[in-house]
Amino acid sequence: MTTTAPHVPVLIDEVIAGLEPATGETHVDGTFGAGGYTRALLQAGARVYAFDRDPDAIAEGRALEDGQDGRLILVPERFSRMAEALNERGIDQVDGVTLDIGVSSMQLDRADRGFSFQADGPLDMRMEKSGMSAADFVNTADEAEIADVLHDLGEEPRARRVARAIVQARPITRTSELAEVVRRALGHKPHEKKDPATRTFQAIRIHLNAELDELEQGLAAAERVLRPGGRLAVVSFHSIEDRIVKRFLRDRSGATPAGSRHLPDARAGGPRPSFEAVAKPVRAGEAELARNPRSRSATLRVARRTAAAPWGTAPKKEGRQG
């Protein structure tokens, strides 16, 4: 385990301002991680259902339960299952949902989890510690599949060159080995701010953990569990993720100019808007960047749930709240 500075939640003040949590409300933190957003919600007096697919995050979060008078409920599930998991606990509607997309600081900071190219560790990258590891993928996938993953999920412009270098360097079992293979393939000048391995590690991680599918399903789940007037706050770090969030909120708010055969037009009898924008997208200012360098690429989007039924479902009856 590496020694790191204390975890600082990204755009925490802006997230809490967007959610407006209050005493007695029920909120979902869909990505508990090191618990930064959950702590802020608890301090505001809310009850929090904190989800995380990573068993390490849940285990370490147990200490935070003490002294909360039952207001913190840790849920060892993917956030895409929030509707089902809440229903199993007698909750149909909540006042707010927070999602901080991607790898957590806790996962990045631990070399033994294999997420970071900045520290040597086993090439793993699995959030749930099950299924295919990053080492399995880079050592068994063919060159074309690796190139497709790097291009589609990492937006790596020289994906084929990197994929070829990975195949030629097999076997690769350590994060430092993979990072060096990519750097040699692309060239790396010490003064460059962005490490050439960034896109490759991002792409493989997203692929192994099916993160984009999880995000799409999680947004739809948030739509189902939020009460009318409830708020959704999503922090994303990559353009691919932000496009998914932007498209979801644009479509659900009725901001799409016109319908198509894929997306019905609300003005022509399609579903009524289920969200409305609260504010423009928020990005980190100078003070935030100085305090928390990880916020450099972060984008926060906040929306308010309307009284319309979730898209693709019958109108929702009055539900139970925690």
Curated annotation (Swiss-Prot):
Q: Does the keyword Cytoplasm apply?
A: yes
Q: Compositional bias (Low complexity) spans?
A: 295-309
The answer, when asked if Transit peptide is one of the entry's keywords, is no
What this protein catalyses is: cytidine(1402) in 16S rRNA + S-adenosyl-L-methionine = N(4)-methylcytidine(1402) in 16S rRNA + S-adenosyl-L-homocysteine + H(+)
Which segments carry the region annotation Disordered?
A: 254-322
Q: Which Pfam families match?
A: Methyltransf_5
Which keywords does this Swiss-Prot/TrEMBL entry list?
Cytoplasm, Methyltransferase, rRNA processing, S-adenosyl-L-methionine, Transferase
Q: What is its main location?
A: cytoplasm
Q: Where, in this chain's numbering, is S-adenosyl-L-methionine bound?
A: G35, G36, Y37, D52, F79, D100, Q107
Q: What is this protein called?
A: Ribosomal RNA small subunit methyltransferase H
Q: Which organism is it from?
A: Rhizorhabdus wittichii (strain DSM 6014 / CCUG 31198 / JCM 15750 / NBRC 105917 / EY 4224 / RW1) (Sphingomonas wittichii)
